[in-house]
Amino acid sequence: RSLLQNRHFCWYWLSTFLSGMGWMIQWVAITWMMVEIDGRPEMVGLVQTCLSLPVIFFAMPAGALSDLFGRKAVVVPAQMLIVLVVLLLVYLIIDQSLNVPWLLAFAFVLGGARASVSPAWQSYVSHIVPKPVLRKAVSLNSVGFNLARTLGPALGGLTLGVLGPALTLVLSGLLSSFLLGVGRSLPRRRGRRVRPVQIWRSVQASVIYSWKDHILRDAYVTVGLFNFSGIVIISLMPLLATSLFDAGSMVYGLLMGVFGTGAIFGAFVQTKFALQVDLGVYIKRLFRVFALSLSVMFLVDSVVTTVVGIFVSGSCWLMLHSSLSALIQTHSKERYRSRCQALFQFMIFGGNGIGALVWGVVAGSFTVTAAFGVSALTIFVGSFYVFYSTNRARRSPPSTQISSALENGSPE
């Protein structure tokens, strides 16, 4: 039976898709407003940092609260905060009082709210589909988000060019509110009084558990390395639109759409490629193909090669993240699952935030293409860590190999 014939998964998938559309439109609008207010590469990269780094502060406590109180207690308030911040941004735009500090502050709050929603919402899929099809469900959910990544920026760029930033943000708020409606239907766990020290101990326990499990630890380090280097293509995308293409917000949205289209393509072909080799070899190849796509964009100053490089990097991005996300959800114990997913988000967005700041500084000191070249080198070097961790996994018992955990479920 098709996963989308499962009513609960269908609503889950649809709300993920629509809220993802809203999030991507917010992303495009906020980033492009920074380009118009202060177009320096460092400031454009700082927007991505403010959207990403809040995960360091909010993801793990949100995951712990989700495990203690239930997902509804986290998802609904955080999603309400997103809608409220969008409305405040709209007011400042209409009042013509929006400046760089306000924009960065709102980007930080939006990033924190999004970081709080993601672990609880993503781990919920393991409760509505059986484990044998969990990987397919995670992949299909990734297709929905990357379909949003394709359509959201294109729609955001179009509405920015035609209607302006205020109405663009209103549209994003309406789309984000859909997840709020579905989130209210989540089962509520009976409330209980929990002291802050209990939340801290819950976070500490999940970190210790993940650190002692080398499969989880290697997955976290791998995704952190990948995102630190790979975020260059997303954070500096608006500068590609203005420098290489000499265009505006609509072309920026279309370039983000190309990235999302590549991600959707990757979702459909990843099973064929992933099952042919050990997962560690598969991840190492994704690292190197991604590095190659960045290298081509660095070496060849061409519109065609840039578009192809963006498409290929989008495919690698999806294939790596969905595989590691499925690994963590199938390998981690149920009582730690939201917190393990939160730690995964911590590494993803922590890498995004630090990387965006670093590549913005590199682009400001040299050129945008130079940032792509240095990033390609670092991600190629990172592939050797994957090779090392893969060899270590092969020396472990077969039931704890990374590929077995991904394909067969938790080794418990």
Walk through the language-model features, giving the residues of each:
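Short amphipathic helix-loop junctions that connect adjacent transmembrane helices
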Residues: V28-E42, S235-M250
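Substrate-agnostic recognition of the 12-TM MFS/MFS-like secondary transporter fold
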Residues: C10-W27, Q48-A64, G70-I82, W102-G161, ...
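Juxtamembrane helix-start elements in MFS-like secondary transporters
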Residues: R40-Q48, L103, G248-Y252, M256
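Alpha-helical transmembrane segments of multipass membrane proteins
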Residues: L87-Y91, A154-L158, L294-V296
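C-terminal transmembrane bundle of multi-pass solute transporters/carriers
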Residues: F57-P61, L68, K72-V74, A78, ...
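Juxtamembrane intracellular "pre-TM" segments in multi-pass secondary transporters
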Residues: R1-C10, R188-V221, L406
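Helix-interface capping motifs at the ends of transmembrane segments in multi-pass membrane proteins
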Residues: V35-I37, Y91-L98, T305
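Hydrophobic alpha-helical transmembrane segments
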Residues: V100-A107, G111, K136-R189, M250-V251, ...
